[in-house]
């Protein structure tokens, strides 16, 4: 029973799928994908459930969402293990993901009232009221790198706003998706309000092409996001929120505090084995002796990072990538850059063939032409050297993406200049690129998104505004517009 449709667990009628641990190859989950008819059935269930769910008082929807938060807390250890085993990330990091899921509940409730909710302004002869209404039936596409937290960032605000949903997890993390949905079931969601369909690209296309869908909330790669944008083109009535990738620059202008700068770079580039959309992909280091020393220290410390299994003791900083194929893709990207003329500073290495364990790689590309402007989703850091700060900003903006950007410097004026000139949705100063505040919007421009940031702003794309002018009585204005004559004519 791998699908949850209209409150029932049913067997998928599509292809057989098996999920294994990307390091040990242990079988974790087996089941069948949905087929197109079951995807349509899930949408119909959501459509039928929508009117009653949307009419529920906000307090009733909030109570169910808060029950879900309590269940997350009660089952934190179990969900942590599921995420860690399925993604290959260490237990410590999977635990932080579940904590982020729990914290998302209170934040989303606050954001609903701050960003949407209801506001009233008194007028002389009545009131002006702003309300927000749910879109209807929305699809949620989840990624594999944070298979609990990132879909949660769409699902929670969408449910609070009164929408009903069809959730398709990544085909690489079906176990996490199913586990989370079982907690929603226990929280008491009415039948049809949230539905689960499993599957890969074909099921995603079947879901996104449904005529009865009111919108789609997506987190994933730019290539898939662009495909969804093309698929929904000519349908302005549908809400589309795209949270995509990045080719993010980190500028090292002043590395006087050498180890702190190296630590920030490791956190920016290699955490989650480089599988965060905000990870630094491009490291811009100022020319000179200090920059040389910084790179030498970075290579030294990064070379000691040994990826390990999810349950190793002591815990590793990074675990495996999502699959052995993903690790192979990073190796191929590194070799491609070497072939273009790049100088390897630290060669990535497969810890064991057939697994997804991969050590970090660092390659210098200063002066190399035709380097692909792409997101290599793994622990590969590209280095460019620059002569002056204006050149650093030019290099930073030399990408079609625009998600995150960072600066290591003690000069506030340089940060102010970067804030004015950077083309990115997240711009950090002496903080890792992978750090983001839940009380701020999360998203980017260019190929990183379609101006629908999530996190604190997720409430914005989960409801539409309704403006009203209201008066309990109908009265004739004391002063009429020119040309209007309401005088009583005497009967002749």
Swiss-Prot record:
Keywords: Arginine metabolism, NAD, Oxidoreductase. One of its GO terms (biological process) is arginine catabolic process to glutamate. GO terms for molecular function: succinylglutamate-semialdehyde dehydrogenase activity. The keyword Oxidoreductase applies. NAD(+) binds at residues 220-225. InterPro entries: Ald_DH/histidinol_DH (IPR016161), Ald_DH_C (IPR016163), Ald_DH_CS_CYS (IPR016160), Ald_DH_CS_GLU (IPR029510), Ald_DH_N (IPR016162), Aldehyde_DH_dom (IPR015590), SuccinylGlu_semiald_DH_AstD (IPR017649). It is an enzyme of class 1 (oxidoreductase). Belongs to the aldehyde dehydrogenase family. AstD subfamily. Catalyzes the NAD-dependent reduction of succinylglutamate semialdehyde into succinylglutamate. This is N-succinylglutamate 5-semialdehyde dehydrogenase. It comes from Salmonella agona (strain SL483). The lineage of its organism: Bacteria, Pseudomonadati, Pseudomonadota, Gammaproteobacteria, Enterobacterales.
